[in-house]
UniProtKB/Swiss-Prot annotation:
Record organism: Homo sapiens (Human)
BP-aspect Gene Ontology terms: aflatoxin metabolic process; carnitine metabolic process; carnitine shuttle; cellular response to fatty acid; eating behavior; epithelial cell differentiation; fatty acid beta-oxidation; fatty acid metabolic process
Record text about domains: A conformation change in the N-terminal region spanning the first 42 residues plays an important role in the regulation of enzyme activity by malonyl-CoA.
Topological domain spans for side Cytoplasmic: 2-47, 123-773
Name of the molecule in the record: Carnitine O-palmitoyltransferase 1, liver isoform
Tissue/organ expression: Strong expression in kidney and heart, and lower in liver and skeletal muscle.
Disulfide bonds: none
Length: 773
């Protein structure tokens, strides 16, 4: 164990001749390089803090302003309207300065004050400009002169070369809608789903709330919105995510898949080496705030970047009543799971990141390790897959001291978690349905004990070289993880690449210490809890009916020819498919985002509208003409786009009602209206995965590098979860989930109805997959 000896910086022994002191120069060198690395990161954070703190100005602009002020002073011009003279008189009390020094100090102080005032003015002006959302409601492709002038003003006040968090202080706060507006929009959303007598009863409850308890709750909510940076996000994180006592696996965590058709190497360790290195390059860019903030409308309107902060070095810690999120400023290791064993792998050597070939070497060492799991070790992660309360109690009882605490700390404080899976997964052209379904289920839950579901994300590499992610949901939403994942897939295949033999490029380094086995001492009582959690998780995992498939008949390229939003098109297809599948309409959830506002997360678009129901009925009514159906489609798609825009601009329904409900609980008052609203099940939960957030390659020039997207488990026991990604111009990937235990649902049947619905709608426009119109 030479590497163990190298880890000891010095040793001493007492002999009859005195103390024998031995120094390990290599260990001392590594300690020095590690300390140097830490100080470099601290300096970069300090520098970035200054740059972000003065944005949209720059530190160098301070010198320009001060020099300008001093120049005018020496030209006998007073730019301060007497302020410099007042500062000078104040400095006369300090007898240690000459008259010339006082003039210089006065000029510098005034220049600094003027510079700060300019920064505040620019920042506030940008916030006012970004509070305008009229551009969102203009017809696509038609921009008014006023909007163009507004865009020009935004660009002027946005500064140059923004860093990731540069716009945070300039983003407006999420507005609180009027209670009556939210109530009216809610009633409009449930009108097509309720019988007449039920709707009358709900209308009475809603109107009573709007004039009675609602305004009182609204007053407290507005008070919070003035004090907090976002009146929704902290409560959403706590009450929707962290206070949930059920399993995270399937119910909350979601997954991301690899490239659909491309497999750059079949060597598991090589794929892991390249991808882990790419992930760490992304983390370095994140630490340095070099990731470009996402901007809409031609890279003009910034979105909030707050969710990036906890991407790495983060773990969800179980509690009996509520979980907490533990985030470390830095982590220099990852933990790798393989064949029931846990290994700690250091990410740095000689003060630098391990190169891809060196990381491959470390992964291969783990794969070649023939040691057996310790008692209770193999299925330990099942604790993170089961109910939260048993895991919290078990953690407190058995992991609070000794080697168990040290090993658990290593897992929870790791940069992220890695699983070297023993199975082969991925798309197979000879059996696309079975292969994609198996791939999705493996990433969603695996064997229930080979992913650490509490980590911000678990990176999974399969035996054949395919890879994927399983992400915990509380710390951020899917678009943030999708941004990382796009970067990793791009860097892995198109920049790092592989040698002809499939290995990572570069050379191995025999001087790098071997990965370290984590040591556990898991008593029998704890192993019983592990088995109980595993049984709970297995029941949940085995109940998931998953169907993932690429829809290749057409994509958004042809949908655009219909002069409608591709998202609206897919949502109406989902409504038609659900009606064909179930023979009825249901409350539908589509995830939108509120990141136009500071610390914004998500909002719900209620996609099942009166207009969409009219369109679906027309589609299944043979008496309706194509012209009538097209007219209803246009009305339904326009209504959907309007609802989506309202959600994005802070005028959604569900987050406002949720926060009013939380206030009512704090005040210990009951609201029959809010109680009924928040108990309504979402039997169709949908989400679109964003694509091409990272400008590293062009899909038109690299059409084979298409992503499979990602998915999630069913939200309701008797409903469907549907995720979709519009890839390039010619492909849409769908991920459909439901539960076998529900006799009414069938994911494959829904998939067939969805394909039919997509084809039926495109046929209305006289278009097809081979259309040249």
């Amino acid at each position: 164990m030479a590497e163990a000896h190298q880890a000891v910086a010095f040793q001493f022994t007492v002999t009859p001749d005195g103390i024998d002191l031995r120094l390990s120069h290599e260990a001392l060198r590594q300690i020095y390089l590690s300390g140097l690395h830490s100080w470099k990161k601290k300096f970069i954070r300090f520098k970035n803090g200054i740059i972000t703190g003065v944005y949209p100005a720059s530190p160098s602009s301070w010198l320009i302003v001060v020099v300008g002020v001093m120049t005018t002073m020496y030209a006998k011009i007073d730019p301060s309207l007497g302020i410099i003279a007042k500062i000078n008189r104040t400095l006369e009390t300090a007898n240690c300065m000459s008259s010339q020094t006082k003039n210089v100090v006065s000029g510098v102080l005034f220049g600094t004050g003027l510079w700060v005032a300019l920064i505040v003015t620019m920042r506030y002006s940008l916030k006012v400009l970004l509070s305008y959302h009229g551009w969102m409601f203009t017809e696509h492709g038609k921009m008014s002169r006023a909007t163009k002038i507004w865009m020009g003003m935004v660009k002027i006040f946005s500064g140059r070369k923004p860093m990731l968090y540069s716009f945070q202080t300039s983003l407006p706060r999420l507005p609180v809608p009027a209670v009556k507006d939210t109530v009216n929009r809610y009633l409009q959303s449930v009108r097509p789903l309720m019988k007449e007598e039920d709707f009358k009863r709900m209308t009475a409850l809603a109107q009573d709330f709007a004039v009675g308890l609602g305004p009182r709750l609204q007053w407290y909510l507005k008070l919070k919105s003035w004090w907090a940076t976002n009146y929704v996000s902290d409560w959403w994180e706590e009450y929707i995510y962290l206070r949930g006592r059920g399993p995270l696996m399937v119910n909350s965590n979601y997954y991301a898949m690899d490239l659909l058709y491309i497999l750059p190497t079949h060597i598991q360790a090589a794929r892991a080496g390249n991808a882990i290195h790419a992930i760490l390059l992304y983390r370095r860019k994140l630490d340095r705030e070099e990731i470009k903030p996402i901007r809409l409308l031609g890279s003009t309107i910034p979105l909030c970047s707050a969710q990036w902060e906890r991407m790495f070095n983060t773990s969800r810690i179980p509690g009996e009543e509520t979980d907490t999120i533990q985030h470390m400023r830095d982590s220099k290791h990852i933990v790798v799971y393989h064949r029931g064993r846990y290994f700690k792998v250091w990410l740095y050597h000689d003060g630098r990141l391990l190169k891809p070939r060196e990381m491959e070497q470390q992964m291969q060492r783990i794969l070649d390790n023939t040691s057996e799991p310790q008692p209770g070790e193999a299925r330990l992660a099942a604790l993170t897959a089961g109910d939260r309360v048993p895991w919290a109690r078990c953690r407190q009882a058995y992991f609070g001291r000794g080697k168990n605490k040290q090993s658990l700390d290593a897992v929870e404080k790791a940069a992220f978690f890695v699983t070297l899976d023993e199975t082969e997964e991925g798309y197979r052209s000879e059996d696309p349905d079975t292969s994609m379904d198996s791939y999705a289920k493996s990433l969603l839950h695996g064997r229930c004990y080979d992913r650490w579901f509490d980590k911000s994300f678990t990176f999974v590499v399969f035996k054949n070289g395919k890879m994927g992610l399983n992400a915990e949901h509380s710390w951020a939403d899917a678009p943030i993880v999708a941004h990382l994942w796009e970067y990793v897939m791009s860097i892995d295949s198109l920049q790092l690449g592989y040698a002809e033999d499939g290995h990572c490029k570069g050379d191995i380094n025999p001087n790098i210490p071997y990965p370290t086995r984590l040591q556990w001492d898991i008593p029998g009582e704890c192993q019983e809890v592990i088995e109980t959690s595993l049984n709970t998780a297995n029941l949940l995992a085995n109940d998931v009916d998953f169907h993932s498939f690429p829809f290749v008949a057409f994509g958004k390229g042809i949908i655009k020819k219909c002069r409608t939003s591709p998202d609206a098109f897919v949502q109406l297809a989902l409504q038609l498919a659900h009606y064909k599948d179930m023979g009825k309409f249901c409350l539908t959830y589509e995830a939108s985002m509120t990141r136009l506002f500071r610390e914004g997360r998500t909002e719900t678009v209620r996609s099942c509208t009166t207009e969409s129901c009219d369109f679906v009925r027309a589609m299944v009514d043979p008496a309706q003409t194509v012209e009538q159906r097209l007219k209803l489609f246009k009305l339904a798609s326009e209504k959907h786009q309007h609802m989506y825009r309202l959600a994005m601009t802070g005028s959604g329904i569900d987050r406002h009602l949720f926060c009013l409900y939380v206030v009512s609980k704090y005040l210990a008052v009951e609201s029959p209206f809010l109680k009924e609203v928040l108990s309504e099940p979402w039997r169709l939960s949908t989400s679109q995965t964003p694509q091409q957030q990272v400008e590293l390659f062009d899909l038109e020039n690299n059409p084979e590098y298409v992503s499979s997207g990602g998915g999630f488990g069913p939200v309701a026991d008797d409903g469907y979860g549907v995720s979709y990604i519009l890839v390039g111009e010619n492909l849409i990937n769908f991920h459909i989930s439901s539960k076998f235990s529900c006799p009414e649902t069938d994911s494959h049947r829904f998939g067939r109805h969805l394909k039919e619905a997509m084809t039926d709608i495109i046929t209305l426009f006289g278009l097809s997959s081979n259309s040249k119109k």
